[in-house]
UniProtKB/Swiss-Prot annotation:
It comes from the Eukaryota. This is Somatotropin. Zn(2+) binds at H38, E192. Residues 1-22 form the signal peptide. InterPro entries: 4_helix_cytokine-like_core, Somatotropin, Somatotropin/Prolactin, Somatotropin_CS. GO terms for biological process: animal organ development; calcium ion homeostasis; growth hormone receptor signaling pathway; hyperosmotic salinity response; magnesium ion homeostasis; positive regulation of growth; positive regulation of phagocytosis; positive regulation of receptor signaling pathway via JAK-STAT. It is found in: Secreted. GO terms for molecular function: growth hormone activity; growth hormone receptor binding; metal ion binding. It comes from Coregonus autumnalis (Arctic cisco). The keyword DNA damage does not apply. The keyword Repeat does not apply. Belongs to the somatotropin/prolactin family. Keywords: Disulfide bond, Hormone, Metal-binding, Secreted, Signal, Zinc.
Length: 210
């Protein structure tokens, strides 16, 4: 009987610590989701502003090219649809989000297009990406259970970003800017989706459907 009473304070302390860790985890998830939502909105606005500088025919042509082309970050294996996203583990979604954010650390520093909004926001974007990367890394450490059940393909090397647009034609500068902004918007939407699903799972909500 005495042993039971001795164990009770230990169990209570353990319970409080677990509850505190869960609350801190949710706080970090809230911050991460808010930051990527802001990045996604910025990406959407910059893309729309850039499209507004193009002629209608030019915009349609670039859109057709982009649909047939691919983003540098497409080398990162990620869920292909909502169903696969929902089936993915929290840890896998966090790792993919980390890789996607990491893939934009260098390109975000080279977004020097004629659009004054882009120039003004380039440093701010780099800082926000860096902060988000640190936050996701903390979430990964807090979610690890000692076993990473990720495929080898999830860790494949990204191609050098500097060579990604080297084969563009004479209108390469406009096309490069269009693809950079379109890919950035696309990837921020992906990360927002993955972090939102992961946050929902960690909060034990009944419905985490997209």
């Amino acid at each position: 009987m005495g042993q039971v009473f001795l164990l009770m304070p230990v169990l209570l302390v353990s319970g409080f610590l677990s509850q505190g860790a869960a609350m801190e985890n949710q706080r970090l998830f809230n911050i991460a989701v808010n930051r990527v939502q802001h990045l996604h909105l910025m990406a959407q606005k910059m893309f729309n502003d850039f499209e507004g500088t193009l002629l209608p025919d030019e915009r349609r042509q670039l859109n057709k090219i982009f649909l047939l082309d691919f983003c540098n970050s497409d080398s990162i294996v990620s869920p292909i649809d909502k169903l696969e996203t929902q089936k993915s583990s929290v840890l896998k979604l966090l790792h993919i989000s980390f890789r996607l954010i990491e893939s934009w650390e260098y390109p975000s520093q080279t977004l020097t297009i004629s659009n004054s909004l882009m120039v003004r926001n380039s440093n701010q974007i780099s800082e926000k990406l860096s902060d988000l990367k640190v936050g996701i890394n903390l979430l990964i450490k807090g979610s690890q259970d000692g076993v990473l059940s990720l495929d080898d393909n999830d860790f494949q090397q990204l191609p050098p970003y500097g060579n990604y647009y080297q084969n563009l034609g004479g209108d390469g500068n406009v096309r490069r800017n269009y693809e950079l902004l379109a890919c950035f918007k696309k990837d921020m939407h992906k990360v927002e989706t993955y972090l939102t699903v992961a946050k929902c799972r960690k909060s034990l909500e009944a419905n985490c459907t997209l």
